[in-house]
C-alpha cells in the first residue's frame, strides 16, 4: 500500500456522496471583476459579496462536491450549483464571521 492510497472495490458500484442529506440547487452570478473560487467546505452563506444569489436561503449549506474540490466563478459568469446542508453539531465559526456558533437555537 502507498501512503494515502485508497483502495476501492469497484464491484460495489458508485459511491453516493452525502446520501440522505438536505440539498438545494441555486443560480449564482459573479458580479465582480476577479475570479472567485469557493472550496468544498466553505459556508456558502458567507462567500464573497460579489457573488449574487438568494443568500438567506443558503444559511447552513456548502457546495455538494467532493472534499478538497472547489468551484470557480469567472467575472460575469453565472452558473447553477448544488448545495448540501452541514451536518454534525451544525456549529459554524470563522469564515467571514457572519455566523459564529450554532445554526439553530436550542429549545
UniProtKB/Swiss-Prot annotation:
Keywords: Cytoplasm, Hydrolase, Plasmid
Catalysed reactions listed for this entry: urea + 2 H2O + H(+) = hydrogencarbonate + 2 NH4(+)
Main location: cytoplasm
A Gene Ontology term for the protein's cellular component: urease complex
SUPFAM superfamilies cross-referenced by the UniProt entry: Urease, beta-subunit
Membrane listed as a keyword: no
InterPro entries: Urease_beta-like, Urease_betasu_sf, Urease_subunit
CDD domains: Urease_beta
Any one GO molecular-function label of the UniProt entry: urease activity
Subcellular location as annotated: Cytoplasm
Pathway assigned in UniProt: Nitrogen metabolism; urea degradation; CO(2) and NH(3) from urea (urease route): step 1/1
GO biological-process terms attached to the record: urea catabolic process
Signals that turn on the gene: The probable operon is induced by urea.
PANTHER family reported in the protein's UniProt record: UREASE (PTHR33569:SF1)
Assembly notes: Heterotrimer of UreA (gamma), UreB (beta) and UreC (alpha) subunits. Three heterotrimers associate to form the active enzyme.
Family: Belongs to the urease beta subunit family.
Protein name per the record: Urease subunit beta
Amino acid at each position: 500500500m502507498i501512503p494515502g492510497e485508497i483502495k476501492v472495490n469497484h464491484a460495489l458500484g458508485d459511491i453516493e456522496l452525502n446520501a440522505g442529506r438536505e440539498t438545494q440547487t441555486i443560480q449564482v452570478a459573479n458580479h465582480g471583476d476577479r475570479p472567485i473560487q469557493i472550496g468544498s467546505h466553505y459556508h456558502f452563506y458567507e462567500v464573497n459579496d460579489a457573488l449574487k444569489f438568494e443568500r438567506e436561503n443558503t444559511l447552513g449549506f456548502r457546495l455538494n462536491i467532493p472534499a478538497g474540490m472547489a468551484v470557480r466563478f469567472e467575472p460575469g459568469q453565472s452558473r447553477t450549483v448544488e448545495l448540501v446542508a452541514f451536518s454534525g453539531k451544525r456549529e459554524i465559526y470563522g469564515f467571514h464571521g457572519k455566523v459564529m456558533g450554532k445554526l439553530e437555537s436550542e429549545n
